């Protein structure tokens, strides 16, 4: 259950270091991190989660979504992904190795996707995941 004292807000430049440290700790996509692409979930002024929306000319990509261990399974990740989708102005994709989480939020696995996402797919496959473990999913609105 989402904590009552949770707030979701756009990240500030001052949040950049914490986001980067947590993203690295969680082995998430840390390529070209820009603080202004993120939202953060805060509880008692502490960042407990974060999510990123990368905007490309042809689509948007939900990426680098993480929640600290003690706050997982409380719906915070889902809440952040829904907020990122809400703010997107184009088709939304995600490249992931946890498709069940994103299926619950309305994403479906696709075989065709914008070429701009191929680099991310290749990165995931090079990072100890095989073809059957890396999924590109599209938000079905």
Language model segments and positions:
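C-terminal "cap" of GNAT-fold acetyltransferases
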Residues: 115-141
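A short beta-loop-alpha structural element at the N-terminal edge
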Residues: 5-18
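Conserved acetyl-CoA-binding loop-helix of GNAT-fold acetyltransferases
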Residues: 73-86
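Conserved active-site alpha-helix within GNAT-family acetyltransferase domains
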Residues: 96-123
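A short, internal acetyl-CoA/4′-phosphopantetheine-binding micro-motif in the GNAT/acyltransferase core
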Residues: 65-72, 98
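Helix-loop element at the rim of GNAT/NAT acetyltransferase active sites that forms part
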Residues: 10, 21-32
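Conserved beta-strand in the GNAT
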Residues: 40, 46-55, 59-66
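A short helix-loop-beta-strand connector motif used in the catalytic cores of GNAT acetyltransferases and
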Residues: 29-40, 44, 61, 130-133
């Amino acid at each position: 259950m989402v904590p009552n004292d949770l707030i979701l807000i756009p990240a500030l430049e001052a949040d950049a270091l914490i986001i980067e440290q947590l993203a690295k700790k969680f082995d998430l996509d840390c390529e070209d991190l820009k603080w202004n692409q993120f939202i953060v979930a805060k509880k008692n002024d502490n960042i407990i989660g974060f999510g990123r929306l990368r905007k490309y000319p042809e689509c948007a990509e939900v990426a680098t979504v993480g929640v600290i261990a003690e706050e997982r399974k409380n719906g915070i990740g889902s809440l952040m992904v829904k907020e990122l989708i809400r703010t997107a102005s184009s088709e939304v994709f995600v490249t992931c190795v946890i498709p069940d989480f994103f299926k619950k939020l309305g994403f479906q696995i696709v075989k065709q996707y914008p070429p701009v996402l191929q680099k991310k797919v290749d990165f995931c496959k090079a990072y100890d995941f095989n073809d059957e473990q890396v999924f590109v999913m599209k938000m079905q609105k």
